[in-house]
């Protein structure tokens, strides 16, 4: 069940199929290259209003407990900003930081990842299933990078933009 190397989570199939269905209703048959382009537009290239730039991750150990601090640089409608989040790992730290920075309440429902290519420079794909806890709306975000942490954080920003991009 691979699509141009992407192994979409089961729940994401319907979400993306709905996007393609709307296009098919307007123009008829949709070619595979156009499907990939729509995937890129919907998930990979969605950088508005929030565009992930970089993140510095620091782990702190206290006994057998770990705390992760993430300092994230991002763009908000083109303006460079920064926030800090603290959590039990990079995804949790960035999620908490985004909630505080943007005044949102989100829940990670699911997370998965896989290699898109092989070798030492392999690209990874990360899928994040998020829910807006205020409205109950859910969506997926996708990130790719040769760094799995960066792919995951891009996935969070992709999902946040899909949830809140049109409303703000």
Model region roles, listed by residue range:
Residues 1-168:
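Terminal or standalone catalytic/regulatory effector modules within metabolic enzymes
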């Amino acid at each position: 069940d691979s699509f141009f190397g992407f192994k979409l989570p089961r729940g994401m199939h319907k979400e993306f199929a709905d996007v393609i269905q709307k296009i098919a209703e307007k123009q008829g048959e949709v070619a595979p290259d156009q499907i990939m382009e729509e995937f890129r537009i919907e998930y990979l290239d969605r950088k508005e209003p929030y565009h992930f730039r970089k993140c510095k991750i620091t782990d702190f150990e206290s006994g057998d407990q770990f705390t992760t601090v993430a300092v994230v640089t991002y763009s908000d409608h083109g303006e460079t900003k920064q926030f800090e989040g603290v959590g039990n790992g990079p995804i949790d730290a960035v999620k908490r930081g985004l909630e505080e920075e943007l005044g949102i309440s989100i829940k990670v429902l699911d997370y998965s990842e896989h290699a898109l290519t092989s070798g030492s420079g392999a690209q990874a794909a990360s899928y994040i299933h998020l829910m807006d806890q205020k409205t109950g709306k859910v969506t997926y975000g996708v990130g790719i990078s040769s760094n799995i942490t960066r792919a995951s954080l891009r996935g969070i920003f992709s999902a946040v933009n899909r949830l809140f991009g049109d409303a703000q």
